[in-house]
From Swiss-Prot:
Monomer. It comes from Mycolicibacterium gilvum (strain PYR-GCK). This is Ribonuclease H. The lineage of its organism: Bacteria, Bacillati, Actinomycetota, Actinomycetes, Mycobacteriales. The gene is rnhA. It catalyses: Endonucleolytic cleavage to 5'-phosphomonoester. Its EC number is 3.1.26.4.
Length: 151
């Protein structure tokens, strides 16, 4: 796998829980793709933070090396530290409770399986250009979802 694809993602809700949006910026050499979407019904920040990398990875047309940046420690820690244990334990936490958002964790695992994904955490709202753009896209996704839901 060559030609690393760099992805920045973000997601959020207003209020949380409430309607939400997600955004992603994908870069490979000189190519840039911006993606966004949203959920006009009740969702959560964590579901939107998970949806963003899922949608970005699923949009890739062939297996590649990916550097994926998120400002969500929940997503980064979940996929790099916790998910294999949850899977081993039948999608139960150490406290024997069902894993929240297990449907999205499974989907993220599947999306990652096609690629070599290296995960990075970036501090949100700290001036990292593509993280800021992903935030703008997440807001756009929320706004578009809300606008579509009233028609």
């Amino acid at each position: 796998m060559s030609d690393v694809v760099v992805i920045h993602t973000d997601g959020g809700c207003r209020p949380n829980p409430g309607p939400g949006g997600w955004g992603a910026v994908l870069r490979q050499r000189h190519h840039v793709r911006e993606m966004c979407g949203g959920e006009p019904a009740q969702t959560s920040n964590n579901r939107m933070e998970l949806t963003a990398p899922i949608m970005a990875l699923e949009a890739l047309t062939r297996p590649v090396s990916v550097h994926l940046y998120t400002d969500s420690t929940y997503v980064r820690n979940g996929i790099t530290k916790w998910v294999l244990g949850w899977e081993r334990n039948g999608w139960m936490t150490a406290a024997k409770q069902p894993v929240k958002n297990a449907d999205l964790w499974r989907r993220l695992q599947s999306a990652c399986a096609r690629h070599e994904v290296e995960w990075f955490w970036v501090k949100g709202h700290s001036g990292v250009a593509d993280n800021e753009l992903a935030d703008v896209l997440a807001t756009r996704g929320l706004q578009e979802a809300l606008a579509a839901s009233v028609v």
